[in-house]
Amino acid sequence: MSTILIFIAALLACSLLAIWRFRVKSRRGSLPWFSAFQDAQTRKLLPEERSAVENYLDNLSQIQQVPGPTGASAAPISLTLNAESNSVVILTHSITRYGITTDDPNKWRYYLDSVEVHLPPFWEQYINDENNVELILTDTLPLVISLNGHTLQEYMQESRGYALQNTASTQASIRGEESEQIELLNIRQETHEEYALSRPAGLREALLIVASFLLFFFCLITPDVFVPWMIGGAILLLAAGLWGLFAPPSKSALREIHCLRGTPRRWGLFGENNQEQINNISLGIIDLIYPAHWQPYITQDLGQQTDIDIYLDRHVARQGRFLSLHDEVKNFPLQHWLRSTVIAIGSLLVLFMLLFWIPLDMPIKFTLSWMKGAQTIEATTVKQLEKAGVRVGDTLHLSGKGMCNIHSGATWSGQSNSPFMPFDCSQIIWNDAPALPLPESDLVNKAMALSQAVNRQLHPKPEDDSRVSASLRSAIQKSGMVLLDDFGDIVLKTADLCAAEDECVRLKNALVNLGNSKDWNALVKRANAGKLDGVNVLLRPVSAESLENLVTTSTAPFISRETARAAQSLNSPAPGGFLIASDEGSELVDQAWPSTPLYDYPAQEQWSAFQRLAQTLMQTPFSAEGIVTSVYTDANGTQHISLHRIPDKSGWWRYLGTTLLMLAMIVSAVYNGIQAFRRYQRHRTRMADIQEYYESCLNPRLTVSPENLI
């Protein structure tokens, strides 16, 4: 067992480590510079290069302290070397720049695709269409240490005053010779509504939640030793799924948005299609990328100075007064109907598994009784139990004397599973009525009398009275023959037992042949008239054995039928009282099991065995304890109480967990099913509602009051 626990603990630790590494890698992958530089070559930073970088950063910090033309100092750029700064990233790429309005003598921002980098201002004149760039990573922006063969080591040999001057240079050759000035108003983080547009739809989190539901289900059917581990795993999966769906984004996950002011213009030909027209709008040298559904509304801002918020990848988040992704999500929330569908389907799956694999009757009853506050009842008499007022969910501890029940209408056979058949000691009849008398039967007495008469004559004993002298009997025995010395008695006892014509047919025919009579009725008349008194019949041993077997087979049905009838006659308890039953079929009496089941006895022995069993079980001590699962009163006034064994602590938790899981799955399936339907309907009309909203904002309809028309 310890090996299994160690293995599970190691597996859990490895899983947590793998998740942590995956999160670290995904966090690195979410950084804007990682995807841009991941295919670049790298090398180690040389000591002289590091010295040049440190000197440049020192001079940069000194220059930033010098007030500008308006008397304000430049905003400090915190470039600090870190452990990753020892690796130089080498790549060939174009450099994009745009201007800002600031007191900083360096009025340009430089980008490699969507990654902003810090370029020493004295290298602006060396920018080409494709640039050989070497840079290192700092705590804030990547720092360019070499551009097209120019390095910071050369800068150390030149005048320090020249280093950060506003050098007169030509425009970057990437976008042409001239570009319009763009004013950088602000740099902000995207709002939660804007972040929601790039956030996944939550399908992965929905699958995690469904996986947690399945783990909770398997907790109900696995051994106790694994349950804590599975519950812990299910809680972790559920927490991870809910956190992914509802947790606010971290600050590091929110991307930067640059708030710009400039004049957007369209550069293109008249023959371009709609998609090309929406993608050929520029703000200065920045090519803007608009949402597709903004196409009808962006033309009114062309050629006019407009406030535009963009991501570093040039996607527009806001333009003008009305076009805003933030307002879209706020007024028309995203409808993630797919994740609700997945959770609803998963909940239904677990619910069906509960219905088909786990009995739900007992968990529901136990949970409801536990919530209602069930009572514990101890009783040793019928009156005590009557006063207690038994309800479903109560715990009973009963002891006393009662009768094992006999089911009505049952077919008593050897295949029945009760060791006390025909009595069922998993059900006890408990009342104050006097015990029933032992059953009696005239037919059984007649059958036994016939069997005894034949047996006495076929197997005589020396002390038995006989109408034949001892010497004659001895001579007959020596000859090998068998003597019936009272044949008339056998005929009369057979007629008394088998009164109907269709009963004991073979035995009657045999006796007719032995009596040398015309038919059975004639033979009976002769016997009644005393004409068979003193008639002796000699039989060969084979004939004697056949006669004995015929008597046995003829009397057996009478005895078996009377045994069953007598058992049914005992199934008539007095009105009132209780019938205490174990719904698991457990025996409620402490009696030794019979060595041989009743119906395994020969027919001639069943009656005596039944009487012994009845004498023991009609008034026998019993003890019963358990939780009441059902209570009802029959037409005879007997109160039927079904008991289930008292579960242990683990069983209680399983019952409670089964009920809670079933209720949770029902609520989850209904709620998420309704949400999926409603969200799907809203998702289909969301884009049309957004366009209608923009139409009402950009092209308002004026309604004229009828009073103004007068």
Swiss-Prot record:
Residues 23-204, 247-339, 678-710 are cytoplasmic. GO terms for cellular component: plasma membrane. InterPro entries: IgaA. The chain crosses the membrane at residues 2-22, 205-225, 226-246, 340-360, 657-677. It holds the Pfam family IgaA. Keywords: Cell inner membrane, Cell membrane, Membrane, Transmembrane, Transmembrane helix. It is found in: Cell inner membrane. Residues 1, 361-656 are periplasmic. Its main location: membrane. It is a multi-pass membrane protein. Belongs to the IgaA family. This is Putative membrane protein IgaA homolog. It comes from Salmonella typhi.
